[in-house]
Each structure stands twice: as C-alpha cells, then as structure tokens.
C-alpha cells in the first residue's frame, strides 16, 4: 500500500507561488540493503500511480526485468495527480476548502523537487537506476541534471528534452475539450467528467497511430455504423473518467507543457551535458507524440547516452506495451 510523505514547510514552486504544505504518496518494493546501493526509482507518466508493478507488468516484480528480490524500488505519485499527492482535490490548509481551480500551476521541475525531498526523507543518497517514460522521462531527466552525482544509471523512454509545439497543441486541444464541459468549473469531485472522456479520446490518437487502429479495430466488411474504433474511443474515455479527475488531468497537462531542460540553463544541449549517468534512451519507431528524432537528440547530447529504437505498431504506448523488448534492451546495456 502507498505511504504518505508529509513536508510541513511551505513548498515554493518554480513560478514563485507556494503550497502551504505538501504531501507525496509513494510506494516501495523489495528491501533496501545496508549500503543503500540497490535503489531503483521509477517516475510515472501522466495518469499512472505510484505502483509500477500494476502498469508495467512484466518489467517490475519478482523474477521480472527488474527483480524486487534484488532491488529496492521506489515510485512516487507526482504533484497534481489524484492518487494521494497534493492536488486540486486536496484541502487548502489556509482556507479549509478544496483547491479546485485555485490550485497553483506547477512545473516538471517542481515535481522533481518533491521527489528529491522524498529521497532525502528516505535517506537515499544515491540512485542506482532512475527510470521514466513519457512524462516520467521528463522528471527523470530533470533530476539527473539537478543532481548529477546522485544518479548512476538513467533509462529514458519515449520522452524529450523540451515538450514540442506538437505536444503542447495536443494538450491544449484536450484542455479545450475539458473546458467545454460546463461542469468542469463546479466544485464537485467528478466535475468535468464528460470533458475528460473527450480529452482522453483525443490523447489516445497521439498515443497510437494509423497502423494500431488498422490492426486492432477492424470491422466486418459490411458494417455501416457502430464501428469498433468508435466504441473503443468511448470505452477508453469512460475507463479513465472512472479512475481519474478532470482538474488533475488539466493541471498535469500544463506541467507537461512546462518541460524544457534548457530553461535558464543556456539551452537544452548545455543542460543535457550536465548529466553524468550512464544513459540508455529508448525510442518507439512509430511514436507520433515523441518522434524518434527527439530521443536521438537526447542520446547525442547526454555525454554517456546510447540510443535504442523499438519497432512496434503501438506508437507512444509501445513504451508500456512492449515490455519484452524493453527488458531485452535494458539487460543488453546494464547488469540488473
């Protein structure tokens, strides 16, 4: 079960705003050895939680790619997410009311700052492997830049150094869908539910691609309505709205847009040059959201960066689905 780390001091955000207090939900697997040298930290993506054994099945667990008998695995729920960390559904201690849309905007750097505070509370001085895909890769990258001596090995999947105009446009389109749901502005916990469903359906088009749907959502030859692709989009939207919150999704997408390792560091190349970790960058050939060229850039400018490209029909979601291929590449480059 997840635990809660409570940071009682005011938590200042990159934009100058302050959270009066901060809670970070996290989970651990395995045991920390005496030398504290067996830590693997997993950073999760947009709507995931702090239990990677659930959403990265086959990669994390006993006798899996990352063996919990050998390693101490930590995963923390990010700020703004509705799985236990401080988020728009939380109570503002200064007002006694739910934050809602009064929650401050935050950045990927703020998320990384919260992870560092948690690691200090857990007395973890060094991380053997830091792993993250998509938005999780953004966090891992920032952390490796901010604390280069702390991270020994870094694995980045389907991510980038700066969120692209394409990615920002997709996120803005999803926020427009959420905002078009008039209930989004109400205080109820499930407000904006229909807007969130539409946003998820939009997002899915960038997570998959033409070939994904061509292979997985094929109709009978004479079908004239009630197409599988239509049903699938609605199903995925409803599936997310049952477990997630529209306001949290809105804020997390804004945080994703903020990602730019070069901000106030000269540029992205100079920022990436600060990373000391042995780094494996994994791209998915068919990824529309984070094209291969973005991972090629990372591998080129991270001093010890190496690039591997996975062939998959699943697009961006390949970083979650192609577990066997990922496992093989990780073991090819590292002794786990």
Curated annotation (Swiss-Prot):
One of its GO terms (cellular component) is cytoplasm. Its EC number is 2.3.1.31. Pathway: Amino-acid biosynthesis; L-methionine biosynthesis via de novo pathway; O-acetyl-L-homoserine from L-homoserine: step 1/1. It comes from Psychroflexus torquis (strain ATCC 700755 / CIP 106069 / ACAM 623). GO terms for biological process: homoserine metabolic process; methionine biosynthetic process. It catalyses: L-homoserine + acetyl-CoA = O-acetyl-L-homoserine + CoA. This is Homoserine O-acetyltransferase. Transfers an acetyl group from acetyl-CoA to L-homoserine, forming acetyl-L-homoserine. It comes from the Bacteria. It is an enzyme of class 2 (transferase). The keyword rRNA-binding does not apply. It is found in: Cytoplasm. The active site is at residues 134, 287, 316.
């Amino acid at each position: 079960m997840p635990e809660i780390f409570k940071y009682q001091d005011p938590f200042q955000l990159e934009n100058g705003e302050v959270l009066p207090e901060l809670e970070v939900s996290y989970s651990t697997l395995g045991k920390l050895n005496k030398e504290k040298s067996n830590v693997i930290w997993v950073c999760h993506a947009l709507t995931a939680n702090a239990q990677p054994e659930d959403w990265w099945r086959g990669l994390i667990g006993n006798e899996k790619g990352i063996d919990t008998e050998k390693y101490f695995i930590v995963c923390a729920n990010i700020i703004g997410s509705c799985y236990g960390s401080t988020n728009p559904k939380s109570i503002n201690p200064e007002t006694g009311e739910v934050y809602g849309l009064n929650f401050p905007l935050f950045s990927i750097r703020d998320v990384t700052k919260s992870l560092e505070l948690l690691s200090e509370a857990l007395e973890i001085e060094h991380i053997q492997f830091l792993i993250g895909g998509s938005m999780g890769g953004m966090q891992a990258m920032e952390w490796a830049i901010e604390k280069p001596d702390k991270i020994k090995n870094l694995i980045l999947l389907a991510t980038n150094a700066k969120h692209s105009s394409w990615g920002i446009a997709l996120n803005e389109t999803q926020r427009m869908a959420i905002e078009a749901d008039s209930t989004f502005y109400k205080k109820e916990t499930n407000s904006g539910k229909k807007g969130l469903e539409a946003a998820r359906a939009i997002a899915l088009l960038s997570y998959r691609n033409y070939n994904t749907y061509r292979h997985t959502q094929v109709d009978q030859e004479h079908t004239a309505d009630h197409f599988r692709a239509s049903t699938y989009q609605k199903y995925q939207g409803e599936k997310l709205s049952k477990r997630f919150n529209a306001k949290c999704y809105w804020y997390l997408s804004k945080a994703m847009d903020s990602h730019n390792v070069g901000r106030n560091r000269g540029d992205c190349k100079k920022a990436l040059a600060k990373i000391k970790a042995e780094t494996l960058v994994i791209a998915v050939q068919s990824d529309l959201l984070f094209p291969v060229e973005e991972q090629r850039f990372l591998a080129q400018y991270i001093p010890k960066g190496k690039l591997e490209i996975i062939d998959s029909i699943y697009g961006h979601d390949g970083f979650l689905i192609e577990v066997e291929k990922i496992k093989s590449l990780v073991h090819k480059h590292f002794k786990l």
